[in-house]
Amino acid sequence: MITPIAVVGPTASGKSALGIELALRLDGEVVNVDSMQLYRGMDIGTAKLTPEERQGIPHHQLDVLDVTETASVARYQQEAVADVEEIMSRGKTPILVGGSMLYVQSLVDDWQFPPTDPAVRARWEARLAEIGVTRLHEELRARDPEAAAIIENNDPRRTVRALEVIELTGQPFKASQPPKDAPPRWGTTILGLRTTADWLNPRIELRTHLMFERGFLEEVEGLVRDHGLIAESTAGRAIGYAQVLDALAGELTLDEAVERTITGTRRYVRRQRAWFNRDHRIRWIDADGDTTARALDILGR
């Protein structure tokens, strides 16, 4: 029986490379679970594999949005579930690869999203316009510290959505999410790459510097000029892209943009670790070892 394999873990831990190796060995196809790799043209700053690095492995949910569009977990879930089931119908193994926490959970769990209420949302959006995203995020933290811990304090859309759900349900945002001890959808095996700060932090620094050496600034300039990328968009708030946009606006030097990208990535990694460590279904693999051999051993292949 074919069942999916998920490869999760923090940024820069080697998920994409392991995903390719598993797909090559298990006749698989990759389903992207990185919310920023959904965007066309956001390549260098998201460490998206090049066509050559994909080694002929089909990739799904990659380059499906323009940078002016808003990524939606609910829409992603609907489309990615269809991709996974279509892959299995052809006798192939879906390899789910990424570290976007809510997107991972939407795919491996049968998450029924809470309803929306236009009046409630409008009230919170008015509050956002009145006090700004930073103070609104502080209000979320006061109401639901766990929700605030997984939502960036510069993400107005998700902050508003969390407050809307809390008001509509009368419960913490987490209560609307499926439990992490339930059997994963399709019997998915979830593999996690375990990292230490001493090992991962230098990789984050190296990767960030290489991004800029390989033309990250020019990538962002092109997205602004040719595709309408703006700082207020979902894509424009991505780590790295937000900092470069600030540099292009004269609010940061390029060196400051590099350093803030590094610190922003480290902060995001801490949230990823906290999130994934709470999921006891994950089979952990040390990222600094032979991850392919260990993964195949866990899978009994």
Curated annotation (Swiss-Prot):
One of its GO terms (molecular function) is tRNA dimethylallyltransferase activity. Its EC number is 2.5.1.75. Residues 34-37 are annotated as: Interaction with substrate tRNA. ATP binds at G9, P10, T11, A12, S13, G14, K15, S16. It catalyses: adenosine(37) in tRNA + dimethylallyl diphosphate = N(6)-dimethylallyladenosine(37) in tRNA + diphosphate. The keyword Plastid does not apply. Its cofactor is Mg(2+). GO terms for biological process: tRNA modification. Substrate binds at T11, A12, S13, G14, K15, S16. SUPFAM superfamilies: P-loop containing nucleoside triphosphate hydrolases. It is an enzyme of class 2 (transferase). Keywords: ATP-binding, Magnesium, Nucleotide-binding, Transferase, tRNA processing. The keyword Nucleotide-binding applies. The record marks S100, R121 as: Interaction with substrate tRNA. Belongs to the IPP transferase family. Catalyzes the transfer of a dimethylallyl group onto the adenine at position 37 in tRNAs that read codons beginning with uridine, leading to the formation of N6-(dimethylallyl)adenosine (i(6)A). HAMAP family: IPP_trans. Monomer. This is tRNA dimethylallyltransferase. It comes from Corynebacterium efficiens (strain DSM 44549 / YS-314 / AJ 12310 / JCM 11189 / NBRC 100395).
